[in-house]
Regions:
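Short amphipathic alpha-helix with an adjacent loop that forms part of the alpha/beta core around
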Residues: 35-44
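Acidic di-acidic motifs
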Residues: 8-9
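Catalytic beta-strand/loop cores that center a nucleophilic Ser/Cys/Thr
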Residues: 112-159
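Extreme N-terminal starter segment of soluble prokaryotic enzymes
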Residues: 1-5
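Two-component/phosphorelay signaling modules centered on CheY-like receiver
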Residues: 18-27
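Short hydrophobic/Thr-rich beta-strand motif most characteristic of the beta2 strand and flanking loop
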Residues: 27-33
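Acyltransferase
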Residues: 172-211
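Cysteine-nucleophile active-site neighborhood
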Residues: 43-117, 122, 181
Length: 211
């Protein structure tokens, strides 16, 4: 069982993410972003930085926690705001996205590796954000997924176990969210999560068109 630290960026989605992780067999400790004990990070098998309002600079210790994960090589997954924080840690610029999206679906195309292993491309995902990483600025990270209009939807570090997704894997609007999280749990030392994710799906049906 992977022992996870979930950094809560004061967001209502965090407990849905935790429910997904626990359903896949992991244990999760949820801590608000302003009370994170950075020294304890290496005692966890993985760290998830949750969605939340505002910018990475206003996300408490999230940026510092990601830096600590990089230093200790602790697997880290950033979701939405957490993804943006990961981009900023490695030199990326986060600015206003071309359009604000809240509860909208988009089709993304991904590289089929890491978080996206075993998932079809194109893939339908649920988006809730007004900011995005500028693609030309994330030179220290590999862009793993984009929308058809070029918005960065996924990144990973080329050498460290650090991943980010701009969309919400836990949303019912996202196809294959359980498998994405299971892929990350496998990197955290819990490969049996892949079997636990089998057959689990969102509550609605999808076609390949963005809403």
């Amino acid at each position: 069982m992977a022992k996870l630290l979930v950094i809560d960026n004061y967001d209502s989605f965090v407990y849905t993410l935790v429910d997904y992780l626990r359903l896949l067999g992991a244990s999760a400790t949820v801590v608000r972003n302003d009370v994170v004990d950075l020294a304890s990070i290496s005692s966890y098998d993985g760290v998830l930085a949750s969605p939340g309002p505002g910018t990475p600079a206003k996300a408490g210790a999230t940026v510092a926690a990601i830096e600590q994960c990089a230093q200790t090589k602790t697997p880290m997954l950033g979701v939405c705001l957490g993804h943006q924080a990961l981009a900023e840690v490695f030199g990326g610029v986060v600015s206003h996205a071309p359009t604000l999206v809240h509860g909208k679906t988009s089709v993304i195309r991904h590289n089929g590796r890491g978080l996206f292993e075993g998932l079809p491309s194109p893939l339908t995902v649920g988006r809730y954000h007004s900011l995005a990483a500028e693609p030309d600025t994330v030179r220290e990270l590999v862009i793993t997924a984009r929308t058809d209009d070029g918005i960065v939807m996924g990144v990973e570090h080329s050498e460290l176990p650090l991943w980010g997704v701009q969309f919400h894997p836990e949303s019912v609007l996202t196809q294959g969210g359980h498998r994405m999280l299971a892929n990350w749990l496998a990197a955290c030392g819990q490969p049996e999560a892949l079997e636990a994710a089998r057959g689990k799906a969102p509550l609605i049906r999808f076609d390949e068109r963005a809403s």
